[in-house]
Amino acid sequence: MLSALIYFAVIGVVFFIFGRVMPKDRIDPRAFPFRLYAFEKDGAVYRSLLVHRWQNHVPDMSRILPHMMPEKKLGTHFDLQTVQVLLEENCTAELIHWLLCVAGLFCLKLCPGMGGVVLYALYFLGNLPYIIIQRYNRPKLIRLQERLQQREVRKGACVCVF
């Protein structure tokens, strides 16, 4: 079991670094796997899980390592570029947590039997809230981005769209 716990720690660090250095220019929040699906009802399904009440109470790497992560709150002054960065970070966070869930399956080799199954289930359930939070916030960020793009078009500025 100790080897599985060490493995979880190692892949956590490796995937964190990967998430920081991976190119973000190919991330499209409107395309698979990040796009919104019909069952999500534009994020309403996550609101029914009360994500808006608990999302700020889970540990967040942007608060733990603020010098390595972009701020995840918009504040009162923001622009299209800020929202774009937040969308990229949102998709990256979801991707990393899904990759952690998949890579975590290796713990079943390190800790065979029911102990490994329970350990993996806990690991998966530990990553699931972060995936849900990203999927809850993405529709709001996309709507905000679209409003800002429309504002830029009305101003006559050049707008870059995915």
Segments (PLM) and residue ranges:
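Transmembrane alpha-helical segments and their cytosolic interface motifs
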Residues: 83-115
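Hydrophobic alpha-helical transmembrane segments of multi-pass integral membrane proteins
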Residues: 10-14, 66, 70, 94-104
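N-terminal signal-anchor transmembrane alpha helix
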Residues: 2-31, 35-44
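Membrane-proximal soluble regions of multi-pass membrane proteins
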Residues: 26-86, 143, 147-162
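Hydrophobic core segments of alpha-helical transmembrane domains in multi-pass membrane proteins
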Residues: 7-12, 107, 116-127
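Alpha-helical transmembrane segments of multipass membrane proteins
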Residues: 11-15, 19, 100, 126, ...
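Inner-leaflet juxtamembrane helices
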Residues: 19-33, 130-145
